[in-house]
Amino acid sequence: MVIGPKSAVFTTVRARGGSLFHLDLHLQRLARHAAVLGIEVPEISIPEGLEGLIRIQIDNGGVSFHSKEFYQEIHMDAEGITVPAPRWSRKIMGTKHGDWDAYRQITSEVLNKGADVAILIHDYCVIDGDRVMPLILDNDGVVWISDSKLGGVDSVTFDVCKGAIEDSGFIISEGRLNERLVARAKEIVLLGTGMGAARLTVLDDIDIGDGSDNLQKVCIEALGDDWR
């Protein structure tokens, strides 16, 4: 029996009234991550009437579906706490794998402290969020995302919004999201299945951004009316 990160692969989809948002993109990511982890993807048959946050998981028992009620306001102004990023081998990093309890524990601790999200740090840089992908807008109109080689999970929500962000005149660039970039950010948007397009307004009790929400508005419009 396989244990550890290669024991399972999963993705979490937003569902309302049996409609799973951007399911095709989620299944594509599931297949990519499964290939990295050495997990064979069987035929997936989606049950009817799913509602909430739906985790689709593949392990040695086959395909399973786990639902959780929506528990956070969509597109919120979020308060975050920095937390050291969990680390695995370079090959494992960036996948939604079977050793995810470290992330779940971080989420639980952050919510118990009254915050909304964890911002994950490694080597003095923002790598990812516990359930979101951070986008940092600087004063030159560049939207910075963490270099994929640093270990962040590729985001389906970002894939949905990317075209609209570029069409709005923003330049997307990968790099190291260091403390200086965060401190001088014009706006930080957090994209994720559960939070939609949230705006980070406080991090470790320090105000973030200049109060503008132009990038957030672009992302909210890209996600559409279903994200409510």
Model-derived regions: residue spans:
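Glycine- and Gly-Pro-enriched alpha-helical subdomains that act as flexible
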Residues: C125-S148
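Conserved alpha/beta cores of soluble small-molecule-handling proteins
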Residues: M1-D123, K149, F158-R228
